[in-house]
Amino acid sequence: MEARAQSGNGSQPLLQTPRDGGRPRGEPDPRDALTQQVHVLSLDQIRAIRNTNEYTEGPTVVPRPGLKPAPRPSTQHKHERLHGLPEHRQPPRLQHSQVHSSARAPLSRSISTVSSGSRSSTRTSTSSSSSEQRLLGSSFSSGPVADGIIRVQPKSELKPGELKPLSKEDLGLHAYRCEDCGKCKCKECTYPRPLPSDWICDKQCLCSAQNVIDYGTCVCCVKGLFYHCSNDDEDNCADNPCSCSQSHCCTRWSAMGVMSLFLPCLWCYLPAKGCLKLCQGCYDRVNRPGCRCKNSNTVCCKVPTVPRRNFEKPT
């Protein structure tokens, strides 16, 4: 009866009994010290534990032909995890205490989880730092790769003709002058300057004054008809339908007279052609730098001597 009265409360004998098979009551339990160490973890360590991903592989370096390939960090993590599994398991004392008290089981699981997470984060940071050192060491050790790095902004190369002064041969091309007007009589200067023209529509159509007149006065239709009706490949009547010096002059003019009844714009071709000749002459007179005299004498001018520059410093 007295023994039953003393053990009336079921939880009191469990608290008064010695822990872990005979440890005195005043002696500190190492598991309590471990729980205190867990609560000391800082917020940065917890974030590092949550942000680590052990299933990703870091950047690897392409192995050189003379060097052995370095082991992959992913296999190293796998071996560490395989060898570290027995370490993360709960000790036999915790498993023995779970049989007797159910209240200490969640605490031991949390302790083992946090400790395993901290160890895995430490291994991940160590392996990442070692892989970075391998990458940096291989990049700095490679001589040709380091020498091939461009460190200066490339400058545009100057053409030799831009800085080269005019030689005597270039000055001799314009040495022959006209006796009347004094202008140069070389082929480049006396060549007539045509009206400007340009290719449009992705360089498929030539835009010039002659083509504008041909399409505006419907002469392009006449040229197409003469081109398909002519049997001689060397016949150029399609290019100059109004020419009087080529063959089949009467036939061409008669055909154009009949077509002008259906295409009245053909009557504007000859006046437009005259305006084109006038514009061509004015443009050539303004832009041609050479001589335009027909019968004149040619005078040879001396090449001017260019004095040498003295680059010495004044005394």
UniProtKB/Swiss-Prot annotation:
Record field: compositional bias (Polar residues): 1-15
Region (Required for interaction with CAV1): 118-315
GO biological process: animal organ development; negative regulation of epithelial to mesenchymal transition; negative regulation of ERK1 and ERK2 cascade; negative regulation of fibroblast growth factor receptor signaling pathway; negative regulation of lens fiber cell differentiation; negative regulation of protein ubiquitination; negative regulation of Ras protein signal transduction; negative regulation of transforming growth factor beta receptor signaling pathway
Location (main, coarse): cytoplasm
Residue segments, region Required for interaction with TESK1: 178-315
Domain of life: Eukaryota
Feature: compositional bias, Low complexity: 108-140
Entry GO CC: cytosol; microtubule; ruffle membrane
Record keywords: Cell membrane, Cell projection, Cytoplasm, Cytoskeleton, Developmental protein, Membrane, Microtubule
Site (Cleavage): P144, V145
Pfam families: Sprouty
Bias (Basic and acidic residues): 20-32
Domain SPR per the UniProt entry, residue ranges: 177-291
Subcellular location per the Swiss-Prot or TrEMBL entry: Cytoplasm, Cytoskeleton; Cell projection, Ruffle membrane
InterPro entries registered for this protein in UniProt: Sprouty, Sprouty_domain
Family to which the UniProt record says this protein belongs: Belongs to the sprouty family.
Self-association and partners: Forms heterodimers with SPRY1. Forms a tripartite complex containing GAB1, METTL13 and SPRY2. Within the complex interacts with METTL13. Interacts with RAF1. Interacts (via C-terminus) with TESK1 (via C-terminus); the interaction disrupts SPRY2 interaction with GRB2, potentially via disruption of SPRY2 serine dephosphorylation. Interacts with PPP2R1A/PP2A-A and PPP2CA/PP2A-C; the interaction with PPP2CA/PP2A-C is inhibited by interaction with TESK1, possibly by vesicular sequestration of SPRY2.
Function field: Antagonist of fibroblast growth factor (FGF) pathways via inhibition of FGF-mediated phosphorylation of ERK1/2. Thereby acts as an antagonist of FGF-induced retinal lens fiber differentiation, may inhibit limb bud outgrowth and may negatively modulate respiratory organogenesis. Inhibits TGFB-induced epithelial-to-mesenchymal transition in retinal lens epithelial cells. Inhibits CBL/C-CBL-mediated EGFR ubiquitination.
Protein name per Swiss-Prot or TrEMBL: Protein sprouty homolog 2
Species the sequence originates in: Pongo abelii
Lineage, opening ranks: Eukaryota, Metazoa, Chordata, Craniata, Vertebrata
Gene: SPRY2
